[in-house]
Amino acid sequence: MIKEELIVKTTALPQSRIALELEIPSNTCKSCVNETINSISRSAKIPGFRLGKIPKQVLIQRIGITQLHASALEKIIDKSWNQALKMESIEPLSEPELVDGFESILKFFNPEKPLKITLQTDIAPEFKLKKSKGLSVEIKKSKFDPKSIDEALEKSRNQLANIIPVNNRPAKLGDIAVVSFKGVYKDSKKEIDGGSSDSMDLELEKNKMIPGFVEGIVGMKIDDNKTLTLRFPEDYSHEDSRGKEAIFDISLKDLKEKELPELNDDFAKQSGNKDSLKELKKDIEKQLKENFDNTQKNIKVEALMDALSKELDAEIPKAMIDIEVRNNIEQTAQRFAQQGMDIKSTFTPELVKSLAESTRPQAEKNVQRNLALKALSEREKITVDNEEIDQKMKEYEDEISKSPKQIDIQKLKDVVRNDLLQEKLITWLEENSAVKEINEKATKLTTKTTTKATTKKGVKTKSKPKVNKKEKN
C-alpha cells in the first residue's frame, strides 16, 4: 500500500505574506476523525454505557456528525499546518488565516477524500541594505557647561533645605504654597478632570502647572482667594484640554519657604559624604562629564542608527510591529508588577489599547532598526563567538551564585550575545561613517537628565544587561 503524503505549494504575497496551498491525504483525515472519536469516547457519559466503552455509531449519533467533523477538522488543519511549516522551513510571524473560512470547508468535508485548503500567514521580510559604508550624519556640537556643576549643587541644597512657615508676606517664586483650587472649562463650565484639589503643596516655580497658574498665585497672601482665566497649551498632555480656556478658583491656605544650607564643608559631608566642598565639586564634575560624554555618544549613535535604517530595503509586515508593541506592553506590565501593582486591575482593556496606540510609532522604529542591524551583521559578517560570551558571563558569576535556580542561564547568554553583537555593530558604524558636528551653544546637563541618557530599545553605551530570572509556574 502506497503511503499518501501531504502536498504543499507556496506562493509569495505582498507585504511579506505567504500562501500555503495544502492537499491533505484522506488517510490523515480519517486518522484525525478516529482520534477525535476516541478522545471524546474517553470522557463522554451516556446512560447505559461504561466510560470509554461507547460504540462508535452511538457516539456519532449522540454528538452529531457535524460537531465530530468540526473537532476533527481543527485537528487536521493544525497537524497539517505544522507539518507544512517544517517541510518548507517557514517561520510564521502570525497565526494562519484560512482563506475559504472554516464553515465553508466544514460544509464539504469528507474524510474519505483528500482535503484541499489554503492558509496565509506573515513571515519575516527579505531585507538588505542599499548601503552600509560611508553613511554621513550631522549632529549638534556641544561642550560641557561648568554651570551645570553649580546647578547640581543648588539642586542638592534644595533637597536638604529646611521648610519653615511664612506668615508676614505675600507668596513669591521659590515658596511652597498650600492651595485648594477648582477648575472648569470656560465654555461648558464642565469640571476639568484632575483640575481640582482640596489641598496641594505647590512649589512656585516657572513652567509648573499650565502657563499663568503659578504666576497667579505669586502675590497672594494666606486666606486670599483669586479667580484665574487661563488657556491650556496646544500640546497639553490631555488631548481633551488642548487649547481650551479654563477658569480656576484658587485659595491660598498656607505658605512655606525653604531655608537653604550654606555651601561649606558641612554641606559636603551631609550631601555627598565628602570631607570638603572642593572634593564634592570635583566628584560632581567627574560624574556630570561622564554623563555628558555618554549623552553625546548616544546622540551620535541615534543619528547613525537613523541613517542606517533609511538604507534598509524591506517591506515590514504589520505582524512584526504588532509583536513589538505586545512585547513593550508586557515589559511595562512586568515593571509595574515588580513595584507591587495589581496588573489585572491596572491594565484595563482601555489602557492596553491606549498603550498600543501610543507606543506603535516607536515600535515600528525599533523593528526597522533591528532589521537594519541584522542586515548589517550579515552583510559585513560581524558575529560574536562563544569565547566572547563566556568572558562577559564572568561578570555575572557572583549574581548567578547567589540565586542559581532563579536565573535562566540560556536567556542571560542570549542577552549577552545580543548586547555584544550590538556593540560591535555600532563600533563598526562609527568607524565606517562620517559624523559632522555643527556648532551649538554649550549644553547644560543636570544630574537628573544625564542619568537617563540612553537611546531607545537598548541601544546604549557601556551597558550591562539585566539578569533574567526564570518564571515561576
From Swiss-Prot:
Q: Domain annotation text?
A: Consists of 3 domains; the N-terminus binds the ribosome, the middle domain has PPIase activity, while the C-terminus has intrinsic chaperone activity on its own.
Entry keyword set: Cell cycle, Cell division, Chaperone, Cytoplasm, Isomerase, Rotamase
Q: Does the keyword tRNA-binding apply?
A: no
- Spell out the GO cellular component terms annotated for this protein, sorted alphabetically and separated by semicolons: cytoplasm
User: Which PANTHER family does the UniProt record give?
Assistant: TRIGGER FACTOR CHAPERONE AND PEPTIDYL-PROLYL CIS/TRANS ISOMERASE (PTHR30560), TRIGGER FACTOR-LIKE PROTEIN TIG, CHLOROPLASTIC (PTHR30560:SF3)
Protein name (record): Trigger factor
Enzyme Commission code: 5.2.1.8
Q: Name one Pfam family in it.
A: Trigger_N
* Positions of region (Disordered): 442-473
Briefly state the protein's biological role. Involved in protein export. Acts as a chaperone by maintaining the newly synthesized protein in an open conformation. Functions as a peptidyl-prolyl cis-trans isomerase.
Its BP terms in the Gene Ontology are: 'de novo' cotranslational protein folding; cell division; chaperone-mediated protein folding; protein transport; protein unfolding
Task: Please list the residue ranges annotated as the PPIase FKBP-type domain.
Answer: 174-261
